[in-house]
Amino acid sequence: MRIAGAIKFVIAVALFLLTFYVISQVFEIKMYSNLGNIFARSAPDTVAHPTTKAPRYRCGISKVCPEKHFAFKIASGAANVVGPKICVDDNILMSGVKNNVGRGINTALVNGKTGALIETTYHDLWGGEVGPFIEFLKKIPDGTIVLMATYDDGATKLNDDARKRIAELGSSLISVLAFRDNWVFVGGKGIKTKSPFEQHIKNNKDTNKYEGWPEVVEMEGCIPQKINE
């Protein structure tokens, strides 16, 4: 009887230990599973999300131009240090980097039909003479887009004849351009109306950004392509 009781006791203990082992294993699996879910939820999202890159328009302007228009961006010079910059249809026509700018009025001539560059030049209207500038203005072909930007001083030697010829290109502000003013303009030879593309900042010692010069004036837009003869 004692032996049978001992056997029963051993069997009971073994069953208890087996049951405890099974329960502990199941609990441990669930615990690891729950911890895995927790860490999975808290882990940072490492999936790369595609970013939308802002579109770049021609000449870096802020909008796309309609069909049959040329994008342009133009900036005057900064004091007598940084030259002006003229861009048309994503082509830099004049800039300090291109080394084709100078003191006075900087001018780029562009074919009104194709947008192709015709000529770039500048005329020193502080230390030079206005005569060559007037002759240049006279010879601009009809249908030509004319882009102008001042650098340092573009007004001292301007006379009434030169101002009149620039006004005929569509300028409304050339009559008030004065010593060291900053001015940018886009017009055309043979234009019938005043151009909407013109900006002017007056040289004023109380508001000048640089000592003796106003801040840079910039302008951008879309020039209609010339269609008809």
From Swiss-Prot:
Disulfide bonds join C59-C87, C65-C222. One of its GO terms (cellular component) is extracellular region. The keyword GTP-binding does not apply. One of its GO terms (molecular function) is carbohydrate binding. Residues 1-24 form the signal peptide. It is found in: Secreted. Residues 68-226 form the GG-type lectin domain. PANTHER family: UNCHARACTERIZED FAM3. Keywords: Developmental protein, Disulfide bond, Lectin, Secreted, Signal. It comes from Xenopus tropicalis. This is Protein FAM3C. Its main location: secreted. Involved in retinal laminar formation. Coiled coil: none annotated. InterPro entries: FAM3, ILEI/PANDER_dom, ILEI_FAM3C. CDD domains: ILEI_FAM3C. Belongs to the FAM3 family.
